[in-house]
Amino acid sequence: MSELCVGINGFGRIGRLVLRACLQKGIKVTAINDPFIDLQYMVYMFKYDSTHGRYKGEVHMEDGKLIVDGQAISVFQCMKPAEIPWGDAGALYVVESTGVFLSIEKASAHIQGGAKRVVVSAPSPDAPMFVMGVNQDKYDPSSMTIVSNASCTTNCLAPLAKVIHDNFGIEEALMTTVHAYTATQKTVDGPSAKAWRDGRGAHQNIIPASTGAAKAVGKVIPELNGKLTGMAFRVPVADVSVVDLTCRLTRPASYANIKESVKKAAHGPMKGILGYTEDSVVSSDFVGDTHSSIFDAGAGISLNDNFVKLISWYDNEFGYSHRVADLLMYMHSKE
């Protein structure tokens, strides 16, 4: 099998952290495209990060390329995905992290530039959606060239929902994510014609917002389709979010039973995806955590044996970026 070589389109928060995740996992990144960031600025942006700290390796530019730890990465500034020469750079897998080319039709433009497969780092309106640890076995290389890694919140919620549903059955559930603010929000009040609340100052407010993350769980766990929905509160922290899953169980279970089932999964089949803690943690304790979801055993509550509130943390930037890298490796292993 040929080596996994990756290209990244869009060098924003996720693009940069996917590069960090790939470097940590030994995945070769051969090209980056971003029409709005020149090479010199790219070096600076990758080297310094206010949330995750300075990159600990060596970063510089040489002969028109980005050099990270001695690895040369071609840099392009194409506006149109079809014009990016992925093939020339040897990047057969592309991470689409601009947030713009989300549909199969739009993301397929990368194939014209020589890419073989595309992973969209966001929910897609029509591409098959995969959550590592939950439904990656449904990936079919013969028919799927464009896939979605879902959202950071779906990646937190789905593994927990799977464990609970497999062990006790979920009759119905509501999710709330208390979510860190992101780059789409405003530093001070500004225009947001489609969703008025989203235009309010991110660090000044708790902002109710919509999210498709809970409904998307129904796409990766079909038995839960129509049984789950949810909403978000955007809060004034820069990173790390937390899911509150309140569910009615089919089969009664004590909170101790639930903890034991989650712990078993976290130390077994979902190791590295689902974490488990009994410590008295707060959000900043999870900055840089690479799990999709870390179950907080001490924060959940049970009203009775059929009605429970479960709490799970996630680094919405870094945990998610590691799953993008894991999905790339999984897909490559199926070639």
Curated annotation (Swiss-Prot):
Localization, UniProt: Cytoplasm
Record has Iron as a keyword: no
Any Pfam family the entry gives: Gp_dh_N
Pathway field: Carbohydrate degradation; glycolysis; pyruvate from D-glyceraldehyde 3-phosphate: step 1/5
Reaction(s) catalysed by this chain's protein: D-glyceraldehyde 3-phosphate + phosphate + NAD(+) = (2R)-3-phospho-glyceroyl phosphate + NADH + H(+)
Record's keyword terms, sorted: Cytoplasm, Glycolysis, NAD, Oxidoreductase
Protein's name in the database: Glyceraldehyde-3-phosphate dehydrogenase 2
Gene: gapdh-2
